[in-house]
Amino acid sequence: MAGELVSFGIKKLWDLLSQECEQFQGVEDQVTGLKRDLNLLSSFLKDADAKKHTTAVVRNVVEEIKEIVYDAEDIIETYLLKEKLWKTSGIKMRIRRHACIISDRRRNALDVGGIRTRISDVIRDMQSFGVQQAIVDGGYMQPQGDRQREMRQTFSKDYESDFVGLEVNVKKLVGYLVDEENVQVVSITGMGGLGKTTLARQVFNHEDVKHQFDRLAWVCVSQEFTRKNVWQMILQNLTSREKKDEILQMEEAELHDKLFQLLETSKSLIVFDDIWKDEDWDLIKPIFPPNKGWKVLLTSQNESVAVRGDIKYLNFKPECLAIEDSWTLFQRIAFPKKDASESKVDEEMEDMGKQMLKHCGGLPLAIKVLGGLLAAKYTMHDWERLSVNIGSDIVGRTSSNNSSIYHVLSMSFEELPSYLKHCFLYLAHFPEDHKINVEKLSYCWAAEGISTAEDYHNGETIQDVGQSYLEELVRRNMIIWERDATASRFGTCHLHDMMREVCLFKAKEENFLQIAVKSVGVTSSSTGNSQSPCRSRRLVYQCPTTLHVERDINNPKLRSLVVLWHDLWVENWKLLGTSFTRLKLLRVLDLFYVDFEGMKLPFGIGNLIHLRYLSLQDAKVSHLPSSLGNLMLLIYLNLDVDTEFIFVPDVFMRMHELRYLKLPLHMHKKTRLSLRNLVKLETLVYFSTWHSSSKDLCGMTRLMTLAIRLTRVTSTETLSASISGLRNLEYLYIVGTHSKKMREEGIVLDFIHLKHLLLDLYMPRQQHFPSRLTFVKLSECGLEEDPMPILEKLLHLKGVILLKGSYCGRRMVCSGGGFPQLKKLEIVGLNKWEEWLVEEGSMPLLETLSILDCEELKEIPDGLRFIYSLELVMLGTRWKKKFSVGGEDYYKVQHIPSVEFIGGYLK
């Protein structure tokens, strides 16, 4: 795997050399030679990765190659950036720079020559020490694919004694196969170790299934399978054993015809255990005739397997075991001799066992591993010792042990393409149960070069590509994600505890990053010891109190420095010694919640010319230097600092690559910013018409998210004209003046892709809303006409929030058939609203309703009785008596699981 990750780095370096070839005047020969050397390195690495080598010699060589590639990329990119800075500088700087050109090119030639020498040395070492032979032979007596397949077959046979908590799932699956004529392919999907094979085997051996089907076949699909081999196994299963030799002699065409005819004339069930890729199923399925008596049950970690082209398809996702079932399974393994006649488990030992079970998250295979670890441990001392180190013990089990969860879960990782391996390893940055912001994650991946220019097709954005990567990891059941019902994109994601242990283990194995927790010098055991020099080029601090950059960070080759902070109720952490003179190669710098020394971002920040990602979210800083303008490679810049009226210098003219810009919410009145060159922006937050011209927005045609503060110097008519060409907008937030002196026509919102809309400004006659909206929030709009007749016709709308001053009328009507997709409705602070009519058939999918601080509203509508989807209603305390049990209006809400009041709960 290490070789594959390094190959990915070599490809990035090759692309850089190829794309910028015209910039290497005076060093062409050295660069051409470097490209040849990279090709040679790639050939070694391909052989290494193909054999999945594990020898220490090869690992050391690969690690050295990785360092060479990093150093080469730093040298080449530094040279190119200095050339670019010189060409975009003023006259005086260009004259001064001209005298240094020859010297710089000579130095660059020497640096590239040094890299080539190191490459030659490492290749010579590989040959002289026999490393190449070690790579070719691999040192394995048995291919890994065969070992994995044997493991799965062994596991699939050992299911009965550990069958716990799956009875309901078996019943459902048997029903799909036996009773449901409209279902022909059933897939059981979920993360490794969930018990998919155990479940499939129970279904396969069920009496109802045996009675329903004439023929049964079980095929364990290896990752390196051939179609011919799979078809042979199916035919052998479906026919007599005597024909085995005859079947082995058949070619693919004959196998296809035999199977097609057999499946056309019989009722057969075929189980495919552990299909990994969509393409695998596509290769297998031509043997199945359409609409006949056959059925297929398959297991996979990939949800998308078998979806394409199969109309009669059903995906079944079993849940992890509940705590009671987890404990039952654990007891069977950890205390195999215990039965009803024997004494109960020691109470203290039971408490400790249940605490350790939390690490398993209900994952059956993880529970088995834990039980196996503890089965031979009889004393409390043994259990306490394992309890402390349970994470590392689980992950550190050898892959030769068939009961090892690490082996099963790591298969998911090993199967990933190289770019997704990087994406997954990057998640090791985040602490346990941390909700990872998916938008920020996408930009971090891009800043690290994990997603590159070639990934962006047909106008795709960084967020599009990041989401596609994330969706692939979700399909492979390697991460868990959450998003609001009204959102069209991912909100946050996180790792299951067990998968996070795998992630940390792999990150340590690859020296991917180093983690320091709470204070300098205390480091997570999963990534090494921070008291020794930081070897990794990525460093993350979790909840530091103080960090001295020059003293505490000892790796001048660091590429990523990220600070994560959880407790925002304490004082900001202190950052000292921030000249950044030793960290000039940083690509990612996230200083969340920092308190700068003297509250000034140092001028030296401008020396970090490699920076792609800079975040000062919630930082205590009162001064931003003009040297920020040197950061021409920035794609992500967050200046949403925790300081009012900060002066922001006009530094954006050369930031042509910027995709995300979040400005301070409150800037000094003298701040004037020219943003017209930021034509690649995808997200712009806190744009103010006081500090910038609305005309700057005209060229930002890639914008998907725009948040504007509209001041009196710009009319709504001018703003509408400036944003009319932003055809890709999905999220639009406009906060403006509430003065009634402003024009009252409203905003022209002709955006066909707009999904989220927030309007906080006076526009009493707004009559039009985009048809694809999924969420709308209105405040201080002063609408004179009931907004419901317009909003309820928006077929995709899932969330509506009406806040204080959004509507000034007295009556609202929700018509039957209106709001067909609405799930959330919140109405707060409408002080003139008196009457609300909800007709039967309105809001049929509504789940959450909030009516607060609407003091003139005379009654809650009778129509709530007909909304059976409601799960939660929130009301002010003045309604409590009427809607309590026995109250005169209780009948309106008696079908709703939860009705909450300010200061109390009804149910």
Swiss-Prot record:
Source organism phylogeny: Eukaryota, Viridiplantae, Streptophyta, Embryophyta, Tracheophyta
Keyword ATP-binding: yes
Record-given protein name: Probable disease resistance protein At1g58390
Any Pfam family matching the protein: Rx_N
SUPFAM superfamilies: L domain-like, P-loop containing nucleoside triphosphate hydrolases
InterPro entries the record matches: Apaf_helical, Disease_R_plants, LRR_dom_sf, LRR_R13L4/SHOC2-like, NB-ARC, P-loop_NTPase, RX-like_CC, Rx_N
Domain text: The LRR repeats probably act as specificity determinant of pathogen recognition.
PANTHER family: DISEASE RESISTANCE PROTEIN RP, DISEASE RESISTANCE RPP8-LIKE PROTEIN 3-RELATED
Residue sites binding ATP per the record: 190-197
